[in-house]
């Protein structure tokens, strides 16, 4: 019953989150900025060996001699791990961000302390799923500059990976120069000038390559996810550029202001209704309307559908098969912010409504069901728009 003062006085709660690991980019930054280079080395070796399973890496905290004896390679230099680690973090997170950009998920606070080394989605406080389609959407009302807006999320990943490379720069440069991993105490015993020289080496030989790795990995996963979601998976072969310029970018423009989840769920039925595109467009615009001004018109949607039909025709699959495949990857239900608000309000009432909580939890675990029952169907609607009730870092 203890009230907590945030934007308003609100009821306190204990929230337990579970993840395979809570290590994040910020853990490396913390030790690096303090000059705790042994901690940087031990942490890196731990992540490489225990989290990624790289058995050729010394186990964090293990002596060099013990590691060599265990591996049966006494006297042999241990292979570098730092550049591999950076690239692994980059690839894992790029694939996760690609799914965010496909499903309209907005994290809200993408600082380096909220980006997992495992590539999992963690610490998403003021998160949201996009309702009214707008690539400039912001889900955190503390983010007045739009730093973490939907369209900026990939950019913020590149920024975060840059900061990871900064934190590991002396290690990266040392490994590049010497062709082996650090020994215990070796970086700590080096001079400031040596560490700066190695850091400069790392920036020169690695940074641009890793940035390109983030971009190509993210775009490749993004194109695969979008073509799968749209039922045109075989068209993935035409390349990212055409998928982006001919289908996805025009989708965001044509469907502007319509609810993203409902629009894509309705598109699942389009393969069986391509004979009357104008009627289908009218139905979609009406059903996915989010009540925002200057939203997409029936003509906008119909024009996109005509182009989309040519892509579906190229699949050469029965309409029913396409529809079923699309419904397996296009959710009917997403956990919108107004739903979590309703759950909290019902639990805070004099007679806590735990049944409603359990119903929402069940729907979260089964988002692709049809949910035809009236009460469940209501939870699949736009409800209260995100922009009218945007959470903050303190929510």
What is each of the regions a protein language model found here?
Residues 146-395:
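Regulatory N- and C-terminal appendages and interdomain linkers associated
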